[in-house]
């Protein structure tokens, strides 16, 4: 596959082959999992077991945990004496919340960098990232940065080195949205370079897991799911309740899932409606709590 940049989008042109390889080589396993009981399917680790072993050596620095997430409710915190939004005051509020409640991380989702420039070194003027990182360190909270795929890919060595030295703990990389040879190669390179600088990776907007989290244990999560964020814009014909009780037996067989469960606004299907500012789940609040137990995830989101 060849690519060319049109605006900020990758334009793909198909080739009459799946992948280009040189000489003899082995190829990844293809798996058919059979279990005696359906309850064994979500805890089947065949994909992980057949992946290439750890390539990064010691990984005691990798710390799974919970993460406070501001994008779910559009930075919509209330009862504060400052204007909530993409600014230091809002993120310090999230850091304080995380510190009080034993939440290990706060994520700075889309908006902290100048997105239209696709440049992770152009930070919006309302954010002083060095100050935030220092403040979070005092509170024993780690920061994770969202990054669009294109901005991360074009200078990932420099990006990883710079933000690791600042004290950032990892990246949530988004909008890959395909699984051709070029994109699979990107995932491997991103995992390898991030590990070099002791950064964790959450692959959002990605293809299904294939065991990369064994080869590079710093890959702690994958989206690749019709997750809760879809409720921000889905219509009433979406049956998320049925999907949620089916997904563990299908998608979770491949690996951990960045579902972002935990909605505290809840509705039955008849009352559900989409909302970017005050999103809701379909189903009950107890159902959302149960998903923390059922859905395997090394980075559990919470939205104060």
Stretch-by-stretch model annotation:
Residues 1-7, 12, 301-304:
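Single conserved hydrophobic/aromatic residue that forms the stacking wall/gate
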Residues 4-9, 16, 20-25, 35, ...:
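Propeptide (latency) domains of metzincin metalloproteases
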Residues 14-18, 277-278:
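Glycine-rich, charged/polar anion/phosphate-binding loops
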Residues 27-38, 45-92, 101:
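An acidic-aromatic substrate-binding cleft motif
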Residues 68, 98, 136:
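Conserved hydrophobic/aromatic pocket- or pore-lining residues that grip, position, or stack substrates
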Residues 86-90, 95-97, 105-114:
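Active-site-adjacent substrate/metal-binding segments within catalytic domains
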Residues 110-280:
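Aromatic- and carboxylate-enriched substrate-binding clefts and catalytic-loop regions
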Residues 272-303:
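Glycine-rich, aromatic-lined ligand/substrate-binding cores of catalytic
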């Amino acid at each position: 596959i060849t690519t060319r940049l049109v605006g900020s989008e990758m334009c793909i042109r198909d080739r009459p082959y799946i992948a280009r390889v040189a000489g003899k080589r082995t190829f990844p396993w293809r798996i058919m999992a059979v279990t005696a009981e359906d309850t064994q399917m979500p805890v089947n680790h065949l994909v992980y077991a057949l992946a290439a072993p750890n390539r990064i050596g010691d990984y005691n620095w990798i710390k799974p945990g919970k993460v406070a997430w501001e994008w779910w409710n559009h930075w919509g915190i209330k009862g504060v004496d400052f204007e909530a939004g993409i600014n230091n005051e809002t993120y310090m509020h999230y850091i304080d919340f995380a510190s009080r409640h034993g939440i290990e991380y706060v994520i700075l989702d889309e908006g902290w960098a100048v997105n239209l420039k696709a440049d992770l070194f152009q930070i919006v003027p309302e954010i002083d990232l060095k100050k935030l990182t220092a403040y979070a360190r005092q509170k024993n909270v780690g920061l994770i940065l969202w990054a669009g795929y294109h901005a991360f890919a074009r200078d990932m060595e420099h990006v990883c080195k710079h933000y690791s030295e600042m004290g950032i703990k990892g990246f949530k990389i988004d909008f890959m949205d395909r699984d051709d040879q070029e994109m699979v190669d990107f995932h491997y390179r991103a995992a390898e370079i991030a590990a070099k600088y002791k950064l964790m990776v959450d692959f959002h907007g990605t293809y299904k897991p294939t065991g990369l989290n064994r080869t590079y244990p710093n890959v702690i999560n994958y989206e690749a799911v019709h997750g809760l964020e879809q409720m921000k814009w889905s219509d009433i014909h979406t049956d998320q309740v049925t999907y949620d009780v089916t997904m563990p037996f299908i998608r979770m067989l491949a690996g951990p899932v960045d579902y972002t469960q935990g909605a505290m606004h809840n509705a039955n299907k008849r009352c559900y409606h989409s909302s970017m500012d005050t999103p809701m789940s379909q189903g009950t609040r107890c159902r959302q709590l149960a998903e923390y137990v059922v859905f395997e995830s090394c980075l559990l989101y919470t939205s104060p």
